[in-house]
Protein backbone atom coordinates (compact mmCIF):
# COMPACT_ATOMS: atom_id res chain seq x y z
CA UNK A 1 0.00 0.00 0.00
CA UNK A 2 1.57 3.33 -0.99
CA UNK A 3 2.57 5.96 1.50
CA UNK A 4 1.78 9.60 0.78
CA UNK A 5 4.84 11.80 1.28
CA UNK A 6 4.38 15.54 1.13
CA UNK A 7 7.58 15.96 -0.89
CA UNK A 8 6.35 13.94 -3.86
CA UNK A 9 5.16 15.96 -6.85
CA UNK A 10 1.75 14.37 -7.26
CA UNK A 11 -1.42 16.24 -8.24
CA UNK A 12 -3.96 17.38 -5.71
CA UNK A 13 -7.25 15.54 -5.39
CA UNK A 14 -9.55 18.52 -5.89
CA UNK A 15 -13.16 19.04 -6.90
CA UNK A 16 -14.24 15.59 -5.74
CA UNK A 17 -17.80 14.99 -6.93
CA UNK A 18 -18.74 12.08 -4.70
CA UNK A 19 -17.50 9.98 -1.81
CA UNK A 20 -15.67 6.75 -2.37
CA UNK A 21 -14.25 4.03 -0.17
CA UNK A 22 -10.63 4.87 -0.87
CA UNK A 23 -8.64 8.07 -0.66
CA UNK A 24 -7.90 9.90 -3.86
CA UNK A 25 -4.38 10.81 -4.87
CA UNK A 26 -2.54 13.09 -2.49
CA UNK A 27 -1.75 16.69 -2.91
CA UNK A 28 1.86 17.28 -2.34
CA UNK A 29 3.46 20.65 -2.57
CA UNK A 30 6.76 21.70 -1.13
CA UNK A 31 6.59 25.32 -0.06
CA UNK A 32 9.12 28.05 0.29
CA UNK A 33 9.60 29.71 3.63
CA UNK A 34 7.45 32.75 4.21
CA UNK A 35 9.31 35.38 6.26
CA UNK A 36 7.00 37.09 6.82
CA UNK A 37 -12.84 37.85 28.95
CA UNK A 38 -16.88 37.11 29.91
CA UNK A 39 -18.76 39.59 32.05
CA UNK A 40 -20.82 37.72 34.59
CA UNK A 41 -22.88 34.96 33.04
CA UNK A 42 -22.20 31.26 33.32
CA UNK A 43 -19.36 30.19 31.00
CA UNK A 44 -21.61 27.98 28.88
CA UNK A 45 -24.00 30.79 28.02
CA UNK A 46 -22.17 32.04 24.97
CA UNK A 47 -20.35 29.48 22.92
CA UNK A 48 -19.41 28.18 19.48
CA UNK A 49 -20.00 24.59 20.52
CA UNK A 50 -23.40 23.25 19.65
CA UNK A 51 -25.34 20.09 19.04
CA UNK A 52 -27.89 21.80 16.78
CA UNK A 53 -27.35 23.07 13.27
CA UNK A 54 -27.45 26.87 13.48
CA UNK A 55 -30.42 28.58 11.79
CA UNK A 56 -28.07 31.09 10.15
CA UNK A 57 -25.54 30.20 7.47
CA UNK A 58 -21.91 31.13 7.93
CA UNK A 59 -20.89 34.62 6.89
CA UNK A 60 -17.42 34.88 5.33
CA UNK A 61 -16.46 31.60 6.96
CA UNK A 62 -17.61 32.68 10.42
CA UNK A 63 -20.29 30.88 12.40
CA UNK A 64 -23.10 32.69 14.19
CA UNK A 65 -22.91 32.51 17.95
CA UNK A 66 -25.60 31.19 20.23
CA UNK A 67 -26.71 32.81 23.45
CA UNK A 68 -29.11 31.47 26.08
CA UNK A 69 -31.02 34.37 27.62
CA UNK A 70 -30.27 34.42 31.37
CA UNK A 71 -32.94 34.45 34.05
CA UNK A 72 -33.32 37.82 35.81
CA UNK A 73 -31.64 36.56 38.99
CA UNK A 74 -28.53 35.78 36.94
CA UNK A 75 -28.27 39.33 35.65
CA UNK A 76 -26.56 42.29 37.33
CA UNK A 77 -28.75 45.08 38.64
CA UNK A 78 -28.08 47.40 35.70
CA UNK A 79 -29.50 44.82 33.27
CA UNK A 80 -32.40 43.67 35.45
CA UNK A 81 -33.33 46.53 37.80
CA UNK A 82 -35.40 45.30 40.69
CA UNK A 83 -35.03 41.75 39.43
CA UNK A 84 -37.14 42.51 36.35
CA UNK A 85 -36.09 41.00 33.02
CA UNK A 86 -35.53 43.31 30.03
CA UNK A 87 -38.67 43.96 28.00
CA UNK A 88 -37.24 42.79 24.68
CA UNK A 89 -34.33 40.72 23.40
CA UNK A 90 -33.04 43.81 21.61
CA UNK A 91 -33.03 45.78 24.88
CA UNK A 92 -30.94 43.06 26.52
CA UNK A 93 -28.41 42.73 23.70
CA UNK A 94 -27.93 46.48 23.46
CA UNK A 95 -27.56 46.97 27.22
CA UNK A 96 -25.16 44.07 27.60
CA UNK A 97 -22.95 44.35 24.55
CA UNK A 98 -23.45 47.63 22.66
CA UNK A 99 -24.84 50.33 24.98
CA UNK A 100 -22.88 52.99 23.10
CA UNK A 101 -23.82 51.82 19.61
CA UNK A 102 -27.33 50.32 19.58
CA UNK A 103 -27.48 50.51 15.78
CA UNK A 104 -25.24 47.43 15.62
CA UNK A 105 -28.00 45.33 17.19
CA UNK A 106 -30.80 47.10 15.32
CA UNK A 107 -29.09 46.29 12.02
CA UNK A 108 -28.91 42.60 12.93
CA UNK A 109 -32.66 42.53 13.49
CA UNK A 110 -33.34 44.53 10.33
CA UNK A 111 -31.48 41.97 8.19
CA UNK A 112 -33.13 38.97 9.85
CA UNK A 113 -29.90 37.88 11.51
CA UNK A 114 -31.27 37.22 14.99
CA UNK A 115 -33.11 33.90 15.17
CA UNK A 116 -34.35 31.09 17.36
CA UNK A 117 -33.27 27.45 17.06
CA UNK A 118 -36.16 26.69 14.71
CA UNK A 119 -35.26 29.55 12.38
CA UNK A 120 -37.89 31.98 13.62
CA UNK A 121 -36.76 35.49 12.68
CA UNK A 122 -36.83 37.83 15.66
CA UNK A 123 -37.57 41.55 15.59
CA UNK A 124 -36.69 44.46 17.82
CA UNK A 125 -40.03 43.99 19.56
CA UNK A 126 -39.60 40.26 20.25
CA UNK A 127 -40.13 39.81 24.01
CA UNK A 128 -37.34 38.64 26.29
CA UNK A 129 -37.92 35.02 27.33
CA UNK A 130 -35.48 33.67 29.95
CA UNK A 131 -33.93 30.36 28.93
CA UNK A 132 -34.59 30.90 25.23
CA UNK A 133 -31.64 30.40 22.87
CA UNK A 134 -30.97 32.93 20.16
CA UNK A 135 -28.44 33.05 17.33
CA UNK A 136 -26.79 36.12 15.84
CA UNK A 137 -23.53 37.41 14.39
CA UNK A 138 -21.26 39.37 16.68
CA UNK A 139 -19.72 42.63 15.55
CA UNK A 140 -16.12 41.95 14.59
CA UNK A 141 -13.37 44.27 15.71
CA UNK A 142 -10.67 45.29 13.27
CA UNK A 143 -8.01 42.60 13.02
CA UNK A 144 -4.47 42.97 11.70
CA UNK A 145 -3.88 41.11 8.46
CA UNK A 146 -2.10 37.83 9.19
CA UNK A 147 -0.28 35.43 6.84
CA UNK A 148 -2.54 33.47 4.50
CA UNK A 149 -0.07 31.14 2.80
CA UNK A 150 -1.44 27.68 3.57
CA UNK A 151 -0.24 25.26 0.88
CA UNK A 152 -2.08 21.95 0.69
CA UNK A 153 0.09 18.98 1.67
CA UNK A 154 -2.60 16.32 1.21
CA UNK A 155 -6.28 16.15 0.40
CA UNK A 156 -8.93 13.52 -0.20
CA UNK A 157 -12.70 13.61 0.18
CA UNK A 158 -12.43 13.27 3.97
CA UNK A 159 -9.50 15.37 5.13
CA UNK A 160 -7.38 18.38 4.19
CA UNK A 161 -3.79 18.88 5.39
CA UNK A 162 -2.18 22.30 5.10
CA UNK A 163 1.16 23.88 5.99
CA UNK A 164 0.24 26.60 8.51
CA UNK A 165 2.41 29.72 8.71
CA UNK A 166 3.71 31.26 11.92
CA UNK A 167 1.43 33.76 13.71
CA UNK A 168 -1.86 32.46 12.23
CA UNK A 169 -4.30 31.10 14.86
CA UNK A 170 -5.88 27.73 14.13
CA UNK A 171 -9.41 28.72 15.20
CA UNK A 172 -11.31 31.88 16.17
CA UNK A 173 -10.43 32.94 19.68
CA UNK A 174 -9.98 36.18 21.57
CA UNK A 175 -9.17 39.05 19.24
CA UNK A 176 -8.78 36.83 16.16
CA UNK A 177 -11.96 35.72 14.37
CA UNK A 178 -11.57 36.38 10.65
CA UNK A 179 -7.77 36.14 10.68
CA UNK A 180 -7.57 32.43 11.49
CA UNK A 181 -6.67 29.33 9.52
CA UNK A 182 -10.19 27.92 9.89
CA UNK A 183 -12.01 31.03 8.69
CA UNK A 184 -9.63 31.68 5.81
CA UNK A 185 -9.77 28.05 4.65
CA UNK A 186 -13.57 27.89 4.78
CA UNK A 187 -13.67 30.85 2.42
CA UNK A 188 -10.81 29.69 0.20
CA UNK A 189 -12.03 26.11 -0.11
CA UNK A 190 -15.73 26.99 -0.24
CA UNK A 191 -16.42 24.43 2.48
CA UNK A 192 -18.35 25.61 5.56
CA UNK A 193 -18.00 22.14 7.13
CA UNK A 194 -14.24 22.37 7.66
CA UNK A 195 -13.21 21.71 11.27
CA UNK A 196 -9.66 21.34 12.65
CA UNK A 197 -8.91 17.84 13.92
CA UNK A 198 -6.11 19.11 16.16
CA UNK A 199 -4.55 22.49 16.86
CA UNK A 200 -1.27 24.32 16.67
CA UNK A 201 -0.45 27.34 18.81
CA UNK A 202 -0.61 30.65 16.95
CA UNK A 203 3.20 31.06 16.89
CA UNK A 204 3.81 27.48 15.69
CA UNK A 205 3.98 26.65 11.98
CA UNK A 206 3.58 23.36 10.16
CA UNK A 207 1.29 20.43 9.36
CA UNK A 208 -2.35 20.92 10.35
CA UNK A 209 -5.33 18.65 9.56
CA UNK A 210 -8.96 19.60 8.90
CA UNK A 211 -11.95 17.30 8.52
CA UNK A 212 -13.92 18.13 5.37
CA UNK A 213 -17.23 16.46 6.28
CA UNK A 214 -19.29 15.93 9.40
CA UNK A 215 -18.87 12.17 8.98
CA UNK A 216 -15.07 12.43 8.95
CA UNK A 217 -14.75 14.37 12.18
CA UNK A 218 -15.16 11.62 14.74
CA UNK A 219 -12.86 8.99 13.11
CA UNK A 220 -10.01 11.49 12.87
CA UNK A 221 -10.64 12.96 16.33
CA UNK A 222 -10.60 9.45 17.82
CA UNK A 223 -7.34 8.79 15.99
CA UNK A 224 -5.73 11.66 17.89
CA UNK A 225 -7.48 10.86 21.16
CA UNK A 226 -6.16 7.28 21.08
CA UNK A 227 -2.68 8.51 20.07
CA UNK A 228 -2.62 6.66 16.78
CA UNK A 229 -0.60 9.47 15.24
CA UNK A 230 3.16 9.85 15.01
CA UNK A 231 4.33 13.47 15.18
CA UNK A 232 7.71 15.16 15.09
CA UNK A 233 8.58 18.81 15.48
CA UNK A 234 11.66 20.84 14.65
CA UNK A 235 12.93 23.57 16.96
CA UNK A 236 15.96 25.80 17.36
CA UNK A 237 17.02 26.42 20.95
CA UNK A 238 20.18 26.62 23.04
CA UNK A 239 21.92 23.38 23.94
CA UNK A 240 21.08 22.42 27.56
CA UNK A 241 23.64 23.83 29.98
CA UNK A 242 23.57 20.63 32.03
CA UNK A 243 26.28 18.38 30.55
CA UNK A 244 24.36 15.15 31.19
CA UNK A 245 21.19 16.46 29.55
CA UNK A 246 23.19 17.80 26.60
CA UNK A 247 25.02 14.50 26.13
CA UNK A 248 21.77 12.52 26.13
CA UNK A 249 20.08 14.96 23.74
CA UNK A 250 23.02 14.64 21.35
CA UNK A 251 22.88 10.84 21.50
CA UNK A 252 21.12 8.60 19.02
CA UNK A 253 18.26 7.83 21.42
CA UNK A 254 17.74 11.41 22.52
CA UNK A 255 16.73 12.78 25.92
CA UNK A 256 13.39 11.74 27.42
CA UNK A 257 11.77 14.66 29.22
CA UNK A 258 8.95 13.98 31.68
CA UNK A 259 6.96 16.45 33.74
CA UNK A 260 3.50 17.21 35.09
CA UNK A 261 1.83 20.04 33.18
CA UNK A 262 -1.35 21.83 34.20
CA UNK A 263 -3.07 24.56 32.20
CA UNK A 264 -4.69 27.15 34.43
CA UNK A 265 -7.52 29.27 33.07
CA UNK A 266 -6.50 32.84 32.17
CA UNK A 267 -2.82 32.16 32.99
CA UNK A 268 -0.57 32.35 29.93
CA UNK A 269 2.13 29.96 31.11
CA UNK A 270 1.39 26.38 32.09
CA UNK A 271 2.26 25.16 35.57
CA UNK A 272 4.94 22.52 35.42
CA UNK A 273 6.58 20.13 37.87
CA UNK A 274 9.84 18.48 36.86
CA UNK A 275 10.21 14.73 37.20
CA UNK A 276 12.16 15.26 40.44
CA UNK A 277 9.44 17.53 41.81
CA UNK A 278 6.81 14.96 40.85
CA UNK A 279 8.59 12.31 42.93
CA UNK A 280 8.92 14.66 45.90
CA UNK A 281 5.22 15.61 45.81
CA UNK A 282 3.84 12.20 44.91
CA UNK A 283 2.50 13.45 41.58
CA UNK A 284 2.53 11.36 38.40
CA UNK A 285 4.13 12.94 35.33
CA UNK A 286 1.52 13.40 32.59
CA UNK A 287 3.80 14.41 29.70
CA UNK A 288 6.67 12.83 27.81
CA UNK A 289 8.82 14.18 24.98
CA UNK A 290 11.89 12.72 23.30
CA UNK A 291 14.30 15.56 22.46
CA UNK A 292 17.17 14.86 20.08
CA UNK A 293 19.71 17.43 18.89
CA UNK A 294 20.58 16.86 15.24
CA UNK A 295 23.31 19.49 14.92
CA UNK A 296 24.84 22.32 16.94
CA UNK A 297 26.38 25.65 16.02
CA UNK A 298 27.46 28.82 17.80
CA UNK A 299 25.92 31.99 16.31
CA UNK A 300 27.81 35.23 16.07
CA UNK A 301 27.14 37.72 18.91
CA UNK A 302 24.88 39.95 16.80
CA UNK A 303 22.62 37.04 15.86
CA UNK A 304 22.48 35.83 19.46
CA UNK A 305 21.54 39.31 20.65
CA UNK A 306 18.82 39.62 18.00
CA UNK A 307 17.19 36.46 19.34
CA UNK A 308 17.68 37.43 22.98
CA UNK A 309 20.17 34.66 23.79
CA UNK A 310 23.44 35.17 25.63
CA UNK A 311 26.40 35.28 23.22
CA UNK A 312 28.75 32.33 23.07
CA UNK A 313 26.18 29.69 23.97
CA UNK A 314 25.76 26.97 21.32
CA UNK A 315 22.38 26.43 19.69
CA UNK A 316 20.92 23.17 18.53
CA UNK A 317 18.54 21.99 15.84
CA UNK A 318 16.13 19.80 17.80
CA UNK A 319 14.00 16.92 16.62
CA UNK A 320 11.13 16.64 19.11
CA UNK A 321 8.77 13.68 19.41
CA UNK A 322 5.86 14.35 21.79
CA UNK A 323 4.35 11.16 23.20
CA UNK A 324 1.59 13.15 24.92
CA UNK A 325 -0.22 16.30 23.86
CA UNK A 326 -0.55 18.83 26.66
CA UNK A 327 -0.79 22.58 26.07
CA UNK A 328 2.63 24.16 25.42
CA UNK A 329 4.27 20.80 26.10
CA UNK A 330 7.29 21.23 23.83
CA UNK A 331 7.83 24.86 24.78
CA UNK A 332 7.57 24.01 28.48
CA UNK A 333 9.84 20.96 28.20
CA UNK A 334 12.68 22.81 26.50
CA UNK A 335 12.28 25.62 29.01
CA UNK A 336 12.54 23.00 31.76
CA UNK A 337 15.92 22.03 30.29
CA UNK A 338 17.04 25.65 30.50
CA UNK A 339 16.89 25.82 26.72
CA UNK A 340 13.79 27.87 25.80
CA UNK A 341 12.90 27.88 22.11
CA UNK A 342 14.12 30.92 20.20
CA UNK A 343 11.42 33.53 19.66
CA UNK A 344 9.22 32.31 22.52
CA UNK A 345 7.34 35.22 24.13
CA UNK A 346 5.94 33.08 26.98
CA UNK A 347 8.88 31.01 28.19
CA UNK A 348 10.96 31.45 30.30
CA UNK A 349 9.07 34.68 31.03
CA UNK A 350 6.01 36.35 29.58
CA UNK A 351 7.09 39.29 27.47
CA UNK A 352 4.96 42.45 27.19
CA UNK A 353 2.33 42.50 24.46
CA UNK A 354 3.57 43.91 21.22
CA UNK A 355 3.30 43.50 17.47
CA UNK A 356 4.36 40.23 15.88
CA UNK A 357 7.99 40.05 14.80
CA UNK A 358 7.91 38.25 11.43
CA UNK A 359 11.70 38.25 11.31
CA UNK A 360 11.88 36.41 14.66
CA UNK A 361 9.00 33.90 14.83
CA UNK A 362 8.88 31.12 17.39
CA UNK A 363 11.39 28.56 16.14
CA UNK A 364 9.00 25.63 16.40
CA UNK A 365 7.64 23.71 13.42
CA UNK A 366 5.18 20.80 13.28
CA UNK A 367 7.41 18.95 10.85
CA UNK A 368 5.97 15.48 10.20
CA UNK A 369 2.65 13.75 10.79
CA UNK A 370 2.06 10.06 10.03
CA UNK A 371 -0.99 7.89 10.57
CA UNK A 372 -3.17 5.18 9.12
CA UNK A 373 -6.15 6.83 7.48
CA UNK A 374 -9.04 5.95 9.82
CA UNK A 375 -11.53 5.68 6.95
CA UNK A 376 -9.55 4.20 4.06
CA UNK A 377 -6.83 2.36 5.99
CA UNK A 378 -4.17 3.96 3.80
CA UNK A 379 -0.84 4.93 5.44
CA UNK A 380 -0.33 8.69 5.22
CA UNK A 381 2.98 10.45 5.84
CA UNK A 382 3.10 14.24 5.66
CA UNK A 383 6.02 16.64 5.96
CA UNK A 384 6.06 20.41 6.18
CA UNK A 385 7.83 22.24 3.39
CA UNK A 386 8.88 25.04 5.73
CA UNK A 387 12.14 25.54 7.57
CA UNK A 388 13.08 27.65 10.59
CA UNK A 389 14.64 31.05 9.96
CA UNK A 390 17.32 30.70 12.65
CA UNK A 391 18.59 27.59 10.84
CA UNK A 392 18.24 28.63 7.20
CA UNK A 393 21.84 29.68 6.71
CA UNK A 394 23.20 26.62 8.48
CA UNK A 395 23.59 22.98 7.40
CA UNK A 396 20.59 22.29 5.16
CA UNK A 397 21.82 18.76 4.51
CA UNK A 398 21.18 17.91 8.16
CA UNK A 399 17.64 19.24 7.86
CA UNK A 400 16.81 17.25 4.73
CA UNK A 401 18.49 14.02 5.81
CA UNK A 402 16.96 13.77 9.27
Model-derived regions, located:
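Charged/polar low-complexity intrinsically disordered segments
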Residues: 29-30, 34-35
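RNA pseudouridine synthases
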Residues: 2-24, 35-402
Amino acid sequence: MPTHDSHRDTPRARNIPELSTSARSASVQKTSVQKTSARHAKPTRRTHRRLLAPPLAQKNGIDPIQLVLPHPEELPEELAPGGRAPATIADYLIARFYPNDPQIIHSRFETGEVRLDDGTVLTTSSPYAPGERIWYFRELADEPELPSDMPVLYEDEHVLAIDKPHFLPTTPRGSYIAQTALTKLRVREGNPLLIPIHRLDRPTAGVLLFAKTVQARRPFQMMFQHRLVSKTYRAVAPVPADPTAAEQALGAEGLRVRSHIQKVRDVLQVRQLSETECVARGVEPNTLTTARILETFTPDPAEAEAWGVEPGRPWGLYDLAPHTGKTHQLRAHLNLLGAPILGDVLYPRVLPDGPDRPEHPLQLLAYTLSFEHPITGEPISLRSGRTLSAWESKNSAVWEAS
